[in-house]
Amino acid sequence: MTGRASAVAARLTPRHPDLPETSVALAHATLRQGARHIAGLAPWADPMGEGPQAVVRARYVGNCLRELDRFLGVLLDVSCLAPRPRLLTLKPDTATRIAVYETDGWDVRPAQRRLRALERSRLCLFHDAGRVGCGDVPQARWLTSGWRDAGSRDLRRYAIGARLRPSALHLHDIAGFYAGLGDRIVSGAPDS
């Protein structure tokens, strides 16, 4: 466990009486480790060419993004602000589940939009080897990815039929986004 995670574990009170005191800190550390793993794929991501290797890379990146989202979901479960955290786990996606933090004075809508874009992107990477087959909504001509280009505040968009090829920069951007979400969630924990 990192020094920061140990410090967080030492001062956090569990939100649910059945969870050990370190659950939030461990879930946070796991999410941060997953983010480091995604960032560590950066040298391997460029260039993401064509052919069978590109298919394997796309599926692997899609799977890693799915696991990173699961780690965020676990952190949400153990640090839930809702009175009945078990009900939160019935929500199908992290973008919906993170809404409980809206009551904490945090406008979660930008994070929700990005989490939904990342969900569509990882499905495209995992199931279609990165080829964009549908847009953000039915009849849309674009898919909004969950990453940004250098110097841009907007998420990158891809036309139908284009290939998603997350670059090293994109993977670092995704890693920073998830790590930042985890930090924000932990900072809202009781007694923190």
Place the predicted regions along the sequence by residue:
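Secondary-shell segments that build the walls of catalytic and ion/ligand-binding clefts
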Residues: L123-H127
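Extended intrinsically disordered or low-complexity regions, especially N/C-terminal cytosolic tails and loops
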Residues: M1-L75, V100-S121, C134-S192
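Glycine- and acidic-residue-rich phosphate-binding/metal-coordinating active-site segment common to enzymes
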Residues: L88-W106
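Short acidic alpha-helical/loop segments enriched in Asp/Glu that coordinate divalent cations
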Residues: G73-T94, V132-Q139
